[in-house]
Amino acid sequence: MAESILDRTINRFWYKLGDDCLSESQFDLMIRLMEESLDGDQIIDLTSLPSDNLQVEQVMTTTEDSISEEESEFLLAIGETSEEESDSGEEPEFEQVRMDRTGGTEIPKEEDGGEPSRYNERKRKTTEDRYFPTQPKTIPGQKQTTMGMLNIDCQANRRTLIDDWAAEIGLIVKTNREDYLDPETILLLMEHKTSGIAKELIRNTRWNRTTGDIIEQVIDAMYTMFLGLNYSDNKVAEKIEEQEKAKIRMTKLQLCDICYLEEFTCDYEKNMYKTELADFPGYINQYLSKIPIIGEKALTRFRHEANGTSIYSLGFAAKIVKEELSKICDLTKKQKKLKKFNKKCCSIGEASVEYGCKKTSKKKYHKRYKKKYKAYKPYKKKKKFRSGKYFKPKEKKGSKQKYCPKGKKDCRCWICNIEGHYANECPNRQSSEKAHILQQAEKLGLQPIEEPYEGVQEVFILEYKEEEEETSTEEDDGSSTSEDSDSESD
């Protein structure tokens, strides 16, 4: 109980003061002040502490009014135990309590198997315990090899790795000639400076140790086995073939956008140095002619300014190109500034020489700017799924009965002139042609007879005897006249 009350009071004190804001000197001063406050009834003014972040609102006093009931009971219990120990003649054993900056006391560790103390649960985190993210020194997944070791397993830039490794091996051998006089020691060095398939090649190959340089033999074998270049048998032919490929690539290279000047120059320079040094001036002129906009001006400057060794320098030509490019950039900046220049200020320098001349005015077109916001905001409503909207069953269309205007079937059929049905339901209806004829007859005021005839031509036959006689006599006369004409012709 004594330890819990003491821990509580000290932790409350450190929490109010703010232990993170104290320096080492302030921390030592605080410990000394607390030790003095425990001795007697001393009044301590904590506002004298040299700290801007430390704010003390009260003056601490160790009077009886500031002691709580639990603390007073604790002090009485300590007094009783001290009196009993003094009566018994034994000296009391005081437990040393050390204060730290973490805001609590250092409690002795419990024995194994004991329950965890509450102190560890209430322990405040210090600056050392906090997590500060730091950038890793190496990129995760990137294989880091030691300096001078050659490992070309599944590597894309094998030629660069082999050239760097060969240069380092040659430097070691030439600077330590006394140690590497024997080819066996050189092979041993090369074997220990390689790993993977390169090491297996050096170990399993029978090298000619009597004639030739052993380093050149190993490098030529690596070029043949790992790069596919036949350097061991015909090195001259391989170099000539590389030069031809470089020349073809330089002629095919094109620069369409001036912003890619650095990449174009790098590729052209890498291929140019594979050719002979005497051919450099011609390739430099070709390089300048491929550059758009400023290539012609840069070429004329290169021919006038280049002299001596600068004729073979592609870097000198690239420098001239960059200077011309910067001039054009400055000119464009000036043109942008001239657009904002006020023409009314031109009369300050010199008087105008134009009198009565009409100024050509150009029509101004107002530029339409696109609105940044919509004139209306569409209201989006969540649509519910309705099965009847898309899957509505088809209606069964049946034969609907037509009614007369009065609501009864008392109309008269105009084909048979009988009430009770329509003309389309008439049993005497035979064809649409007959119905058309009946319509025409009805317009003329004619009515159908009770007993209809079968034929179409026999429906409206008019029987007049006088007309028949006249027609018959006319026919007879016509026949006689025709006979007379025939006889006369004979």
UniProtKB/Swiss-Prot annotation:
Protein name, UniProt field: Capsid protein
Compositional bias annotation for Basic and acidic residues: 95-111
Subunit structure: Interacts (via nuclear localization signal) with host importin alpha.
Lineage: superkingdom: Viruses
Residues spanned by motif Nuclear localization signal: 122-125
UniProt-recorded Gene Ontology molecular function terms: nucleic acid binding; structural molecule activity; zinc ion binding
Source organism (scientific name): Cauliflower mosaic virus (strain D/H) (CaMV)
Compartment(s) where it occurs, according to its Swiss-Prot or TrEMBL record: Virion; Host nucleus
CCHC-type zinc-finger residues: 411-428
Keywords, in A-Z order: Capsid protein, Host nucleus, Metal-binding, T=7 icosahedral capsid protein, Viral penetration into host nucleus, Virion, Virus entry into host cell, Zinc, Zinc-finger
